[in-house]
Amino acid sequence: MLNSRSELLDQFLRQQGIRDEAILAAIRELPRERFIPEALSHQAYQNNALPIGEGQTISQPYIVAKMTELLELTPTSNVLEVGTGSGYQTAVLAKLVEHVNSIERIKSLQWNAKRLLKQLDIYNVSTKHGDGWKGWESKAPFDAIIVTAAAESIPNDLLFQLKDNGHLVIPIGEESQQLLRITRQGEEFFSEVIEEVRFVPLVAGELA
């Protein structure tokens, strides 16, 4: 597996422009096969999104690395992840900052991710079963918010839970999706289009 990880990192992520050594180290250290069904473990270090049940997926390693890099994290960044999913993106974030807050609307995924993170000795994460569209007001404001499912429009609650100069990285759209980075400056928000992407939809309101 170490050879597969090294190959992924050295030949693919770096070729794709990922430069943050801390992010590359986090991905290198984490056993991605633990976050996916055992039957798919042979694909763990390929650059593919993979199903994790409940109609959800684990993002491809490049997208995990790219979205994380766009957050411009420091060790003391207050981070919110919307969409815990398998917990893989959560674990990458947890290697980079002192504490991660993560919301998941599907209870079984939230529970499984919480259990797995503990098995991997990752304890600097708070998880919540809730509606990601609303953010996590009691933990706000955030230096960085990462959304791992595509919203039809940008949730206002997430914008106003950002700190000044904070970044929101979010896929937007339905059939055609774009990855955006939104930066707050006072009461204004500035948006950059990063690239085209494909994510499962961010479902508002409904908990499962």
From Swiss-Prot:
Subcellular location: Cytoplasm
GO annotation, biological process: methylation; protein modification process; protein repair
GO CC annotation: cytoplasm
PROSITE patterns with a match to the protein in the record: PCMT
Keywords in alphabetical order: Cytoplasm, Methyltransferase, S-adenosyl-L-methionine, Transferase
Highest taxon, organism lineage: Bacteria
Gene Ontology molecular function terms on file: protein-L-isoaspartate (D-aspartate) O-methyltransferase activity
Top-rank EC class of the record's enzyme: transferase
UniProt EC number: 2.1.1.77
A Pfam family per the record: PCMT
UniProt keyword annotation of S-adenosyl-L-methionine present: yes
UniProt catalytic activity: [protein]-L-isoaspartate + S-adenosyl-L-methionine = [protein]-L-isoaspartate alpha-methyl ester + S-adenosyl-L-homocysteine
Chief localization: cytoplasm
Active-site residue list: S59
Coiled-coil parts of chain: none
Family: Belongs to the methyltransferase superfamily. L-isoaspartyl/D-aspartyl protein methyltransferase family.
Function statement: Catalyzes the methyl esterification of L-isoaspartyl residues in peptides and proteins that result from spontaneous decomposition of normal L-aspartyl and L-asparaginyl residues. It plays a role in the repair and/or degradation of damaged proteins.
NCBIfam families per the UniProt record, alphabetical: pimt, PRK00312.1
Protein known as: Protein-L-isoaspartate O-methyltransferase
Native source organism of the sequence: Aliivibrio fischeri (strain ATCC 700601 / ES114)
